[in-house]
Every structure is written in structure tokens, then in C-alpha cells.
Amino acid sequence: MTEDELYPTPDEYDEYTMKESTTYTPPKVWKWDQDEENRFSKINRPIAGQTHDKDLPVGEHPLQVYSLATPNGVKVTVMLEELLALGIDEAEYDAWLINIMEGDQFSSGFVGANPNSKIPALVDHSTASPTRVFESGAIVMYLAEKHGQFLPTDQSARAECLSWVFWQMASAPFLGGGFGHFYAYAPDRLEYPINRFTMEVKRQLDVLDRNLADREFICGDDYTIADIAIHPWYGALAMGMLYESGEFLDVGSYKNVQRWTKALQERPAVRRGQRVNRVWGDEAKRLPERHSASDLDS
């Protein structure tokens, strides 16, 4: 069976669902309007590569983080703060601000660290030659393996943990790029995409809620990188911090997610990691760059 036989064409889909076509008629070949100005103009473009020459700064620690305190960025800084809380001095790091609204992610230096031009990126200078790691899930896994923490060694438990990490990586785009965009950022609020992505986000919350019904943490009794990866997205969602959507999604009804979220928010390393590379919100919780533990003590 071919792909064409597996999936209906757009016209066939309209026929199946008894829907009228939308007012937008796509051109035969889409072309990028480089003169278009909107809040995302400096974030999104249809090509990869650098737009300007600029080296990345390098601090005194072996681990160099280039990021912003989005949910994906917070995963990495929370992971590092958790390692430091265990007394692992080798996890000391410098965290440099990458302002994606200004196009910092398209500098030659950042593209060298992450050819995908998305935050966060990590460069480990403790290896024979600098090791670059990009994609937030890959970074937390790299750090867990490097330092032997927050990732089970038992084969079955490890598989469970990594399954949840990859669940988060696969699910969050529906939450952020799907629901978040159409609910909070799109020029017009349209019923169809909001309903479509709302249904998926509520399904994801239910997946988590059912999993946490008889588990203290995502994978059981132990706190792991699965919790570290999932909490910045779904914990923030449960607290009503994402897209001002708490009431709309009825997040309070997911009791197990609420209990888990509150427990993680009590962890000092979580609260510290959430501040790093943060340039919005409460002034007292902002820390554009972090170069030593004392930066977070003020």
C-alpha cells in the first residue's frame, strides 16, 4: 500500500469531515516573504545556517551552556543544579544568554554548537576536544551518563526512563508549537486548530495523570531525568504558567500531576535552575547569565 493510499488528500479530507475549505488557498509553491514583520520574524526562517559572524563566549568552567529560560532551556539548568546539589563539582557551568528574539541563535558561533539553531546548546570542554551536544533531551541524557546520576542502570528501569524522556520530546511540540501558538500567539484565534491541539494537550495531561496515580515520580520511587525533562513543560502548564491557559484546560482536575508538580517545585535545584537565563517576569527571579553558584544567592 502506498502513502497516497494510506492518507486522504486535503480535498478528500474535507469530503470525509463534511467541512468547507478554509479561506486560505495555498499557492502551488510556497515562497518566503522576507519583508514580513511580526513577533516571530527573527525566530523562524525556512533555511538553516548563520546570518552573521559572532563567536560564542567561553567562561572558566568546562561546561558551557548557551540558552534561554524557556521550558527546553530550563531542563538543562535544572539538571546541572541538581548535579551540583549532589556535590558534583565537575557539573559547574557557565550559562550564556541566547536572545532568540534578536536572532542570536543564527550567529556563526551558535550554529557551530547547534546546526539546528535552537536553544539550548552545551559545549563540554573537559573532553579531549570540545564536545557539542544539542537538543535538550540529548543534553540531559549526556549529563546523566557523564556523571552517573538520575538515569537508572538497570536495563528495564533505564528503558522506562528513556521512554518517558522521548515521550516528552515527541509530545511538547503539540503543546508549544501547536496549542500554545494557536491559543496565545497566532494573529487570529481560530476554533479548529485550538480545539484540535487542546484535545491533544488534555490527552497528554491524562497520560501523565494516570501514570502518576501510583508513582511518586514519573518512573516510580526515584527522581530521574524523566522528571527533569517533563516538569518544565507540564509542571509549568499545571501551575497555569504557560499561555495563561490554566482555567481553559482545567489543569486543577489533574490531581496527580498537581501533586507531582508541587513536590518538584519544592526542590531547591529546580527553583535555582528556573532562574538561569531568565530575562522576563519578576525581577527577583531573573538571572540573564550564570557563572558561579553565588550568582543565584543574591
Language-model segments: which ranges?
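GST-like domain detector, emphasizing the conserved glutathione-binding G-site
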Residues: M1-N195, M199
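Residue-level recognition of oxygen-bearing side chains
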Residues: A138, N256, A269
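Acidic/histidine-enriched, glycine/proline-rich intrinsically disordered or flexible terminal extensions
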Residues: R39, R278-S298
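Short, flexible helix/strand-to-coil boundary loops that buttress conserved ligand/catalytic motifs
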Residues: D154, G176, M241, Q274-N277
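GST-like fold's C-terminal all-alpha helical module
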Residues: T2-Y13, K19, S163-E266
